[in-house]
Amino acid sequence: MGKLVVSLDGVVIKEVQITKDKTTLGRRPYNDIVIDNLAVSGEHAVLQMVGQDVFIEDLNSTNGIYVKSKRVRRQHLNDGDVVVIGKHELIYMDERARFGRGHFAEAHAQPRPDEDA
């Protein structure tokens, strides 16, 4: 399961768990993730869960969505990807990847050559 951390000018505004197959994002109040800013279209983008993967898709917004500084129409999100919409940054955090790098990875790590076995 993943989450988005939404920030503006480096200040975290909200954190949203991605739990639905489709999560809408836009300026209008009926969206699942509301960003009240004129640079954000009323119905700007949708996050889609496909199995364990999360994709973001632009819904023909005026200002687009950017991932890794490139304007994209549809993009698979990886842990740590930064999505830019207007002046807002949305950081995608994949909790599976974080667990894999943490507890599981440490438990199965091979000792370094300079460590005593």
Q: What are these regions, as identified by a protein language model?
A:
Residues M1-V6, H88-A117:
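Regulatory inter-domain linker segments that are low-complexity and enriched
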Residues V5-L8, V12-K87:
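Forkhead-associated
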